[in-house]
Curated annotation (Swiss-Prot):
Residue positions where N6-acetyllysine is found in the record: K10
Function statement: Variant histone H2A which can replace H2A in some nucleosomes. Nucleosomes wrap and compact DNA into chromatin, limiting DNA accessibility to the cellular machineries which require DNA as a template. Histones thereby play a central role in transcription regulation, DNA repair, DNA replication and chromosomal stability. DNA accessibility is regulated via a complex set of post-translational modifications of histones, also called histone code, and nucleosome remodeling.
Organism: Mycosarcoma maydis (Corn smut fungus)
Chain residue ranges for the region called Disordered: 1-33
Name this protein carries in UniProt: Histone H2A.Z
GO molecular function: chromatin DNA binding; identical protein binding; protein heterodimerization activity; RNA polymerase II cis-regulatory region sequence-specific DNA binding; structural constituent of chromatin
Post-translational modification: Acetylated once deposited into chromatin.
SUPFAM superfamilies: Histone-fold (SSF47113)
Lineage of origin: Eukaryota, Fungi, Dikarya, Basidiomycota, Ustilaginomycotina
Record gene name: HTZ1
Record Gene3D superfamilies: Histone, subunit A
Length: 135
């Protein structure tokens, strides 16, 4: 007869061979590049009254940060390619963020070394005269 205490539990092939179980990070489990554990630690330390932070909150926050970073880097990379450069500069980040309406409304910060967007008001541009247009 089998022992009634042998049901379930964590006894398996890995424990029978005395091999330690391979650790996987929370980021790897979630399929993310950003550090879920570190973000969870920062979320816990930054809250008032030290309220509890769920594990899914850190995963969700990491996913949002990773997505926004990828979006900005893709747009900045396109801006640097348009200028035929291989390195992303603060100017490229500025052009990428200010060129996208949603990112522009979300990022209201000043980017150091980003410069300004070129813009000339329509009333300041001289209309071509009719004499030059006829010639």
């Amino acid at each position: 007869m089998s022992d009634p205490r042998a049901k379930g539990g964590k006894g398996g092939a890995a424990n029978a061979k005395n091999e330690p179980k391979k650790q996987t990070t929370q980021s790897a489990r979630a399929g993310l590049q950003f550090p879920v554990g570190r973000i969870h630690r920062h979320l816990k330390s930054r809250t008032q009254n030290h309220v509890r932070i769920g594990a899914k909150a850190a995963v969700y926050t990491s996913a949002i940060l990773e997505y926004l970073t990828a979006e900005v880097l893709e747009l900045a990379g396109n801006a640097s390619k348009d200028m035929r450069l291989k390195r992303i500069t603060p100017r490229h980040l500025q052009l990428a963020i200010r060129g996208d309406e949603e990112l522009d409304s979300m990022v209201r910060a000043t980017i150091a070394g980003g410069g300004v967007l070129p813009h000339i008001h329509k009333t300041l541009i001289k209309a071509p005269s009719k004499k030059k247009a006829l010639e």
